[in-house]
Amino acid sequence: MKNQNQKYVFPISIKPGQTYFSDANHKPFLWLGDTCWRLFWEYTLEEAQTYLENRAKQGFSVIQVQLLPQYFHQCNRRGHKPFLVEGNLHSVNPIYFDEVEKVLQYGKKLGLSFAIAPIWLSSWEQDWYQYFHGQTVLDYSAFVAQRYCHLDNIIAWIHGGDDDALSLHSTIHQSANIYKQINPDIAATYHAGISGGWEFFGDQNWFDFGMAYSYDKDDCFKQFQDFKSRYPDKPILLGESHYEGNEGISTDILRHYAYSSLILGNCGHTYGHKDIWIGTMFWAQSLCSAASHHMEVAKDIWDQLDWSKMQPDFKGRWLQTLRSKMPHASSKPIPTCININRNELVAYISDFRWFRSTQPVHKGKWIDPISGREKQLNWLEEDTLQIPGYNATGHTDWLLYLELKEVNK
């Protein structure tokens, strides 16, 4: 399988007024991310290269990583710690950061971008938050921004990390401004607790795009709706959610979040596998997991769409549920987007409800998110639709593509 990412030209950035990323030639860039948070210290260079080669071949375009080990006393696989004195952010160990660059440079050769969390601020799983104060952390911020400013495949800085970190907001703001001053073209966001970081920093000049974070389908929908109502001219994507390999998490759950993000955010999505982000002994076997293949299918489908022109529908304007009081049916909103200029509609439907398009349909098709295979529309009545049964894994989720005769704007 060939590397699917070479068509993009670095650097990748957000142009003014765009709700998506684009490359140096202004080509829309689909953020298809993978969380390998511990890549820089749990993986050897050779293992990291194997991982990156696989993700590039599968069509992933962004790797989300943490720059520092989980705890200040940890080292990377070559025995190097990021700081020569534990907990002293002034005592940077250049060898550690040089080895990070080797991974970043290898990813660049493969056409991969990196979204990097410079210092993870979770107070319940890491201890770096204890040192996030004063001039020391601002000097560290300047060091990191300058150390990697020559790399044009860093797509974003992820500030925060699994925590609202309310007591640290003043320092977070100062730190983020330093990154923006030194790296003005690298986008920035905030990774909060189970919510959206825009609630705290969305109005700041350094905040460029939203990173939703949710483990609940209804909440995920509401996060996208909230962000788009506040910041209609900024991108948003689901940056973290359920992980493949976690107990009770089936692939249809992962697909629901993926397509919700792609459809409602108009920007991209980030997938993750438990054994890969943690770096367990099973990480290599997990590279070819079922859901990672489904993400590859999603990319192939989206590459055929003029997706950057799609607009999400949060009000149920384009698809109307007709009947849901029946087994395995729902009346909840259908993730839907529409390209008004091309009269195209895309939706993700995962139950047996009856529904209709509010606009006259010229033609359409169902797309199996497992295989990418297509099926003809199955009309129950003159204008009534229902999913065509079970997909290739025996689940009930499908993509609907419609070409409309006209769109009543």
Language model: regions and residue ranges:
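Hydrophobic anchor at the start of a short beta-strand
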Residues: 114, 236, 364
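Residue-level preference for short coil/turn positions at secondary-structure junctions
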Residues: 17, 59, 150, 184, ...
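Active-site mouth of glycoside hydrolases
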Residues: 2-221
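Structured core elements
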Residues: 64, 80-81, 237-238, 270, ...
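Aromatic- and carboxylate-lined catalytic core of secreted/periplasmic carbohydrate-active enzymes
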Residues: 244-245, 254-378, 387-409
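Extracellular glycoside hydrolase catalytic/binding regions
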Residues: 146, 160-293
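A generic structural motif
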Residues: 35-36, 373, 381
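Short strand-edge motifs at loop-to-beta-strand transitions and within beta-strands
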Residues: 383-385
